């Protein structure tokens, strides 16, 4: 029954309307019983007494005609004589339920307040209860005989047009309300159905169909969030495809080269050529090994929930160790490396930070002009740790700088790197809640700046 949100909302709303109508009826019934019933009884009793006074003062001899006239004026009247013979005028009562004790009470000269004393019933409105006990009664004198006269207004006749009007109004109200509820429910459910279809497309890998924001309420916000999610998923999917293509290319190229070298090695070559081929194969295998290590490290960084950042990192020792390890490359290009390294302590992952700093220093050595200078600085300034590496090589155009940290990015085809070093470095710095940036110009060279919060 409630398999769809559309049905659920429609049934809930209709139930609320019907429940509200029932509660309103009960409230009105209670209000009539405790507030209006006595007033209604007194008003009808006053009318009946005025009728008796007029009957007495006018010396009406034809009682039948007089009460028939009152009945024609939309009153229901019952007259009981001393022998308990009952005569009715006006519209007939639905039931004759008055007790003999009530009749005797009136014949003895006491007034009867049946409307005021009508017992309370939850689902029956006493005002419309067309029974003889729901009347007021007083004695009349007719030819020296007492008559018990009971009267109530003919509600059905008096309010017949109003009841018709009220019934039409209620039917129209319920009909229009239910129609509008169904229509408004559909307008609410329609964008949700569209979102459902969109999620099914996303589930099947279709990230190209946009989700339009058709509203400005909570559902519109949901549409906006779904569209943002779709764009993010599309970006991730594009990156995944691009990543797979790049990995395939990076693996295929050295494998093709190795295959060609092995084919050459099988032919008749002299010892010098054989040694050269073996050396090239060794370089390609080393390249593949480094690529595999970097891919594994990237995978580890992308799923970093298991990583610990609780090492007490001694940056001065860490950077000094990297410089000592890279001394051969520095000497080979006859570079001058100047360092100004303060004693800075930091809580993080020592292995990853060593990798990030090593990548920056290795790049500075690799892309420096021979006989140039490299400047390495580390200091703490007002709670922020700064690590900068500057080299004097070819400047990096501003249009290229935003792409330096993309995975597999290479400035030119001759670059024999994997294009993953700076991407790895950026991921490591971000995991430590830091930032990395680059500036490059002819005067100052190229500077990579890493900033880390002292309290990580």
From Swiss-Prot:
Chief localization: membrane
Gene Ontology terms: cellular component: plasma membrane
Highest taxon of source: Bacteria
Post-translational modification: Autophosphorylated.
Keywords associated with the record: ATP-binding, Cell membrane, Kinase, Membrane, Nucleotide-binding, Phosphoprotein, Transferase, Transmembrane, Transmembrane helix, Two-component regulatory system, Virulence
Class in the EC hierarchy, top level: transferase
SMART domains: HAMP, HATPase_c, HisKA
InterPro entries from the UniProt entry: Bact_Sensor_His_Kinase (IPR050398), HAMP_dom (IPR003660), HATPase_C_sf (IPR036890), His_kinase_dom (IPR005467), HisK_dim/P_dom (IPR003661), HisK_dim/P_sf (IPR036097), Sig_transdc_His_kin-like_C (IPR004358)
Residues annotated as domain Histidine kinase: 246-456
One Gene Ontology MF term: ATP binding
Catalytic activity: ATP + protein L-histidine = ADP + protein N-phospho-L-histidine
Chain ranges of the HAMP domain: 186-238
Record PROSITE patterns: HAMP, HIS_KIN
Phosphohistidine PTM positions: 249
EC number: 2.7.13.3
Spans through the membrane: 9-29, 164-184
Pfam families: HAMP, HATPase_c, HisKA
Membrane topology: Multi-pass membrane protein
Cellular localization per UniProt: Cell membrane
The protein's role, per its UniProt record: Member of the two-component regulatory system HssS/HssR involved in intracellular heme homeostasis and tempering of staphylococcal virulence. HssS functions as a heme sensor histidine kinase which is autophosphorylated at a histidine residue and transfers its phosphate group to an aspartate residue of HssR. HssR/HssS activates the expression of hrtAB, an efflux pump, in response to extracellular heme, hemin, hemoglobin or blood.
Protein name: Heme sensor protein HssS
Species in which this protein is naturally found: Staphylococcus haemolyticus (strain JCSC1435)
Lineage: Bacteria, Bacillati, Bacillota, Bacilli, Bacillales
């Amino acid at each position: 029954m409630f398999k769809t949100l559309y049905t659920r909302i429609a049934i809930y709303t209709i139930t609320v309307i019907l429940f509200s109508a029932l509660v309103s009826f009960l409230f009105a019934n209670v209000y009539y019983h405790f507030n209006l019933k006595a007033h209604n009884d007194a008003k009808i009793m006053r009318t009946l007494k005025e009728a008796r006074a007029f009957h007495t003062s006018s010396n009406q001899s034809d009682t039948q005609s007089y009460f028939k006239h009152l009945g024609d004026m939309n009153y229901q009247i019952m007259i009981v004589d001393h022998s308990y013979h009952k005569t009715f005028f006006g519209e007939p009562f639905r039931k004759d339920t008055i007790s003999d004790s009530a009749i005797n009470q009136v014949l003895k000269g006491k007034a009867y307040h049946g409307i005021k004393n009508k017992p309370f019933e939850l689902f029956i409105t006493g005002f419309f209860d067309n029974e003889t006990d729901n009347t007021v009664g007083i004695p009349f004198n007719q030819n020296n005989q007492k008559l018990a006269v009971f009267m109530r207004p003919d509600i059905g006749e008096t309010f017949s047009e109003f009841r018709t009007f009220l019934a039409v109004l209620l039917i129209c109200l319920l009909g229009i309300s239910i129609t509008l509820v169904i229509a408004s429910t559909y307008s609410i459910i329609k964008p949700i159905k569209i979102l459902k279809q969109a999620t099914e497309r996303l589930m099947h890998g279709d990230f190209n169909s946009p989700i339009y924001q058709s509203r400005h309420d909570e559902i519109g916000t949901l549409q906006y969030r779904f569209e943002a999610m779709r764009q993010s998923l599309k970006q991730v999917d594009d990156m995944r495809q691009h990543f797979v293509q790049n990995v395939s290319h990076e693996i295929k190229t050295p494998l093709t080269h190795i295959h060609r070298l092995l084919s050459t090695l099988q032919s008749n070559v002299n010892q010098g050529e054989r040694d050269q081929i073996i050396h090239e194969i060794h370089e390609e295998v080393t390249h593949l090994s480094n690529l595999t290590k970097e891919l594994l490290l990237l995978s580890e960084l992308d799923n970093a929930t298991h990583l610990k950042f609780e090492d007490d990192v001694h940056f001065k020792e860490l950077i000094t160790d990297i410089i000592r390890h890279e001394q051969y490359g520095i000497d080979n290009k006859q570079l001058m490396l100047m360092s100004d390294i303060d004693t800075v302590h930091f809580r993080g992952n020592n292995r990853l930070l060593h990798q990030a700093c090593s990548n920056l220093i290795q790049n500075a050595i690799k892309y420096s002009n021979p006989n140039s200078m490299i400047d390495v600085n580390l200091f703490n300034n007002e709670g922020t740790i700064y690590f900068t590496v500057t080299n004097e090589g070819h400047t990096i155009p501003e249009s290229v700088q935003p792409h330096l940290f993309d995975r597999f990015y290479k400035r030119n085809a001759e670059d024999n790197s994997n294009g993953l070093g700076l991407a790895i470095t950026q991921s490591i710095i971000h995991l430590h809640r830091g930032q990395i940036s680059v500036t490059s110009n002819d005067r100052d060279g190229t500077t990579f700046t890493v900033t880390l919060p002292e309290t990580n």
